[in-house]
Amino acid sequence: SGKTMVYFEALKDIINKGFQGLILLPEIGLTGQFEKKFIEFFGFTPAVWHSGITKKKKEIIWSGIANGEIKVVIGARSSLFLPFKKLGLIIVDEEHDQSYKQDEGVTYNARDMAIARASFENIPINLITPGPLKINSQSPSFTQVLFKDDLKPQ
């Protein structure tokens, strides 16, 4: 979609500057289709992080993120807590989705935690949603960009 291409361009810029990127998706089921779009655009495979991957794979990904070898992670809520060496951008796709809320064990909202991490690390965050949320549109730092189908700003 148009919104995906816009934030892919932002992510490409971050990667070209030597930083890592994190894309949060609300559901594990969205990962496969999203990963295909990513590979078509970037020409490489991102790391994928969620509860369904094996312990061995998690260890490999954890190490690759910590040493900076892995440039992009597509993940569920828990990917926020990965040890990025040089995180440069967080993207929360479908930020309005209730799946970002963790209600069992330690309760938190991954969207809010992403905002906090971006603030703590002094990096940009892109909150992607079909329309502005009231909480965002009232923020003094909120900028709304609307796109038509041809991707030209309105």
Enumerate the predicted regions with their spans:
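Conserved motor-coupling elements within RecA-like helicase/translocase cores
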Residues: 36-73, 84-85
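Motif I (Walker A/P-loop) of helicase-class P-loop NTPases
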Residues: 3-12, 114
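Conserved catalytic network of the ASCE P-loop NTPase/AAA+ motor domain
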Residues: 13-17, 39-41, 64-67, 81-84, ...
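Hydrophobic residues in beta-strands of the RecA-like P-loop NTPase core, especially within AAA+ ATPase
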Residues: 75, 92-93
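Residues immediately C-terminal
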Residues: 30, 79-81, 96-101
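Loop/turn-to-beta-strand initiation segments
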Residues: 19-21, 45, 68-72, 86-89, ...
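Conserved SF1/SF2 helicase motif Ia
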Residues: 10-34
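Post-DEXD/H (motif II) to motif III coupling segment of the RecA-like Helicase ATP-binding lobe
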Residues: 89, 95-153
